[in-house]
């Protein structure tokens, strides 16, 4: 993830009003064990070092990610191989995992609960030409569009 992208993530998340940013960071910690006070550079380092492949399994087992969303990050066969060899995810895979956790944490902070956030994230949006927000996370541009929509919702500009 570029320094610019990291800065955008921080700025977008910080726009969340009141306790929203704290809630976002607490949820990010619950999802990926990233300390609430971790700097953007520390998050960047975690991504470049590669998350443990088992995090993806845990998030799928907990229902945070569907198997289809998991496969958007890494194919199941490759994931199983990484786990068997005790290898971390690659930088690209870790970046995709972070984007999914980041958007999930933002949605949970905006909607106030995981169930509402999950429903919103899995429902096709006209704005995204019928794709779900989770399907948009395959690129940084798509992720930015989902962030912007969440911020508009947080600011009361509609669903």
From Swiss-Prot:
It comes from Pseudomonas putida (strain ATCC 47054 / DSM 6125 / CFBP 8728 / NCIMB 11950 / KT2440). This is Antitoxin Xre. InterPro entries: Antitox_Xre, Xre-like_HTH, Xre/MbcA/ParS-like_toxin-bd. Probable antitoxin component of a type II toxin-antitoxin (TA) system. In vivo probably neutralizes the toxic effect of cognate toxin Res. The gene is xre. One of its GO terms (molecular function) is DNA binding. The homodimer can be superposed on the Cro helix-turn-helix binding domain, suggesting it probably binds DNA and can act as a transcription factor as is often the case with antitoxins in type II TA systems. The C-terminus of the antitoxin inserts into the putative NAD(+)-binding site of toxin Res, blocking access to the active site. Keywords: DNA-binding, Toxin-antitoxin system. Belongs to the MbcA/ParS/Xre antitoxin family. It holds the Pfam family Xre_MbcA_ParS_C. Homodimer. Forms a complex with cognate toxin Res; the 2 toxin molecules dimerize and each contacts an Xre homodimer. Most Res-Xre contacts are between the antitoxin molecule closest to the toxin.
């Amino acid at each position: 993830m570029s320094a610019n992208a990291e800065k955008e993530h921080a700025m977008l998340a910080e726009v969340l009003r009141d306790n929203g940013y704290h809630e976002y960071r607490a949820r990010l910690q619950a999802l990926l064990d990233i300390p609430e006070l971790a700097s953007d550079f520390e998050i960047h380092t975690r991504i470049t070092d590669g998350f443990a492949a088992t995090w993806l399994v845990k998030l799928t087992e907990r229902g945070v990610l569907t198997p289809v969303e998991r496969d958007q990050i890494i194919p199941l066969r490759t994931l199983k191989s990484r786990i068997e060899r005790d290898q971390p995810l690659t930088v690209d895979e870790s970046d995709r995992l972070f984007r999914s956790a980041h958007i999930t944490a933002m949605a949970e902070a905006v909607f106030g609960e995981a169930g509402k956030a999950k429903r919103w994230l899995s429902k096709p949006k006209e704005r995204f030409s019928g794709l779900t927000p989770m399907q948009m996370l395959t690129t940084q541009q798509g992720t930015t569009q989902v962030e912007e929509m969440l911020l508009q919702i947080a600011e009361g500009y509609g669903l």
